[in-house]
UniProtKB/Swiss-Prot annotation:
Organism: Yersinia pestis
Similarity remark: Belongs to the UPF0125 (RnfH) family.
Protein name listed in UniProt: UPF0125 protein YPO1103/y3077/YP_1053
PANTHER family per UniProt: UPF0125 PROTEIN RATB
Cited HAMAP family: UPF0125_RnfH
């Protein structure tokens, strides 16, 4: 059975992680993340909480991968973007 190659990425403000893995055709997003070793390397990644995507498009852990996909693990937001914009606008008025 032919293999597919995918990249798994996770970015922090101070460091980015990029792993290339080979998987069998029919593998899922979750399979790629587990094969990348990032879950062991970064225990702060919780697949129950962190959203995932392929090329900035949100996907589910069970979605099947294609050759050349880039699986992205997103960090949870620590602040509401709308509220941050409001605060910056108020500061700019001063």
């Amino acid at each position: 059975m032919p293999d597919i190659r995918v990249e798994v990425v996770y970015a922090l403000s101070e460091r980015q992680y990029l792993r290339t893995v080979s998987l069998v055709v029919g593998s899922t997003v979750e399979d790629a993340i587990k094969a990348s070793g990032l879950l062991e390397l970064r225990p702060d990644i919780d697949l129950e909480k962190n959203k995932v995507g392929i090329y900035s498009r949100p996907v589910k852990l069970g979605d099947k991968l294609n050759d050349g996909d880039r699986v992205e693990i997103y960090r949870p937001l620590i602040a509401d973007p709308k509220e941050l914009r409001r605060q910056r606008a108020e500061q700019a008025k001063k």
